[in-house]
């Protein structure tokens, strides 16, 4: 073994500390706080260099995410006749242009327009002011900073939701006010079912509230209706369907909605 690998040799012979994994996990969890602290405290040339390094890291990450998203859509094969070679017989009927992106974008557009096709039970709702929606949270050692806000209404955050680091989290969605399921009533069948919420489609108050997943009266939500056994005209099982919230969830403590059929 090379002389400079004495640490690896010691690990192989004696193993690691019993709390090594826990210490490693905590060190990685503290990393975001350390980066935040350095970004706030470093000034002058060091601050500029640190900001430049962080910027390049973020750009690289965005490029990596974009490349990963594009790799999911298979690219069209380049025509072989440009190089002068003849196309084989089994490739003559293949399309050279890639239509996957066009199809996926048209499907997304149709999904966006779906909510507008229905005549909703509540066409008009009462407007909610920002003072009613958000509560100012005082932070800092002497509680003088007031840039944080806490949502006072019920919200939906989804399955894989992870909170941002505390120092960077501007809007807080309390765990006690998060909803995962709704009491959905089918208007034609006259039955009420307790169904899981898939997403918040549109909040009539503001696009920002839609993005935050705020559940207020008149909000269009997508629910999982696979339990109802609904099928399309083509015989396929319907997975998600839109519903409109008809009550005030923050007053009742639950979400009641009417299915849009």
Swiss-Prot record:
Keywords from the named record:
Nucleus, Ribonucleoprotein, Ribosome biogenesis, rRNA processing
Location of the region described as Disordered in the Swiss-Prot/TrEMBL record: 1-35, 61-84
Motif Nuclear localization signal 1 per UniProt: ranges? 15-22
Kindly give the Pfam families that the UniProt entry links to this protein.
Answer: Ribosomal_S8e
Keyword Nucleus in the entry? The reply is yes
The subcellular location is: Nucleus, Nucleolus
Query: Which BP terms does GO give this entry?
Result: maturation of 5.8S rRNA from tricistronic rRNA transcript (SSU-rRNA, 5.8S rRNA, LSU-rRNA); maturation of LSU-rRNA from tricistronic rRNA transcript (SSU-rRNA, 5.8S rRNA, LSU-rRNA)
In the UniProt record, does the keyword ATP-binding occur?
A: no
> What is the similarity comment for this entry?
Belongs to the eukaryotic ribosomal protein eS8 family. Ribosome biogenesis protein NSA2 subfamily.
Q: What PANTHER family does the database record attribute to this sequence? A: RIBOSOME BIOGENESIS PROTEIN NSA2 HOMOLOG
What is the protein name stated in its UniProt record?
Ribosome biogenesis protein NSA2
The species this protein belongs to is Vanderwaltozyma polyspora (strain ATCC 22028 / DSM 70294 / BCRC 21397 / CBS 2163 / NBRC 10782 / NRRL Y-8283 / UCD 57-17)
GN (gene name): NSA2
């Amino acid at each position: 073994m090379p002389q400079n690998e004495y640490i690896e040799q010691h690990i192989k012979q004696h193993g690691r500390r019993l709390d090594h994994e826990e210490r490693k996990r905590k060190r990685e969890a503290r990393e975001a706080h350390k980066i935040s602290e350095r970004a706030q405290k470093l000034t002058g040339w060091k601050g500029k260099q640190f900001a430049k390094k962080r910027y390049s890291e973020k750009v690289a990450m965005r490029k990596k995410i974009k490349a990963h998203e594009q790799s999911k859509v298979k690219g069209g094969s380049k025509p072989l006749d440009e190089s002068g070679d003849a196309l084989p017989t089994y490739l003559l009927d293949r399309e050279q242009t890639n239509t996957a992106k066009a199809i996926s974008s048209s499907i997304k557009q149709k999904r966006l327009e779906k909510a507008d096709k229905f005549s909703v039970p509540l066409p008009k709702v009462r407007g909610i002011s920002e003072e009613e929606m958000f509560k100012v949270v005082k932070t800092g050692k002497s509680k003088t900073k007031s840039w944080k806000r806490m949502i006072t209404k019920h919200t939906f955050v989804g399955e894989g939701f992870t909170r941002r680091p505390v120092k960077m989290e501007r809007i807080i969605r309390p765990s006690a006010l998060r909803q995962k399921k709704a009491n959905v009533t089918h208007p034609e069948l006259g039955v009420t079912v307790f169904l899981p919420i898939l997403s918040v489609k549109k909040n009539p108050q503001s696009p920002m509230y839609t993005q935050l997943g705020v559940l207020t009266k008149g909000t269009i939500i997508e629910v999982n209706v696979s339990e109802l056994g609904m099928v399309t005209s083509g015989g396929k099982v319907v997975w998600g369907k839109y519903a409109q919230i008809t009550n005030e969830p923050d007053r009742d403590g639950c979400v009641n909605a009417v299915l849009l059929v």
